[in-house]
Amino acid sequence: MACPEHTDIPAEVRSRARGCMLGQLAGDSLGSLVEFQTKEQIRAEYPGGVRLLADGGPFDLIAGQPTDDSEMALAMARGLASLGRYCAMQTGKAYRSWLDSAPFDCGVTIRNALNGAPNPTSQANGALMRVSPLGIFGAGRKRADVMAWAKKDAALTHVHPVCGQANALFAALLAHAIREGATGAELYETLLGWMKRMKLEPALREAVERAAHEKPRDCQSQMGWVLIALQNALWQMLHAPSFEEGVVDTVMQGGDTDTNAAIAGALLGAIHGEEAMPAQWREAILNCRPELGNPRVRTPRPEYCWPVDALELVDKMLEKGWKP
């Protein structure tokens, strides 16, 4: 059941927050159909683009089923909705419980960190892929707080400063987009303004600046790099003609398609709102129940990993986080 609407939360803000979560889930599911493939392989199989959420992919999922990316995001979202605050200790426990559920996929950096062996050199995208709930919860909070929480969350698994800084910038950008309703160009200028006052890793700064005029040239050879995902998301923010086309174009680039599209989808959804979501994507996500015993389900998962209550989670996070 949806959370009662807070009278101070404008309908447009609620729409953009829901768009952010739905965008995360849709990009993840769409990208999972062709994960690890090259863009040439994808174009040969989908000459018109990957456009429908469907059963299949390398992990044999049902339409709308989250991968590790969004299962972890849902774990964070459930904590925020329940506690009404970000707690690194509780979130870390949730991630550990998730790992103990035997997920069908898990990044090496995440697995090692949750098992007590963090990799200080990894610049993988596993923290950025799950951070969108902090953008939703933080839409009514101070930017400095959102950035601090996002850095803490990254540090649970990804200790390299590039990962922490990318998390901070992206979560704050999502929160700003949801609250203010800015265009992609306006958001980009806002982001550059923040960066002028921050000490950032040179590679991160370069990726953000490059996004103004080009998408990542190669999503395959450095598959899983956080700056590929970030640069692509920002490029789509600036250049994609619509939410749908930005997500589809991301998937068509190949490589770590589910993660890149989850990240881009969260940002595009935060800009365009839930109304921009194709109806088929929305229906697949909100009716996805990968339960044991269903003959259609080849990869069953615990109920807390299902996306069926995604909109209720968004409403609860907004309610708990809103401080106008």
List each language-model region with its residue ranges:
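Structured, active/binding-site neighborhoods that engage oxygen-rich ligands
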Residues: 1-324
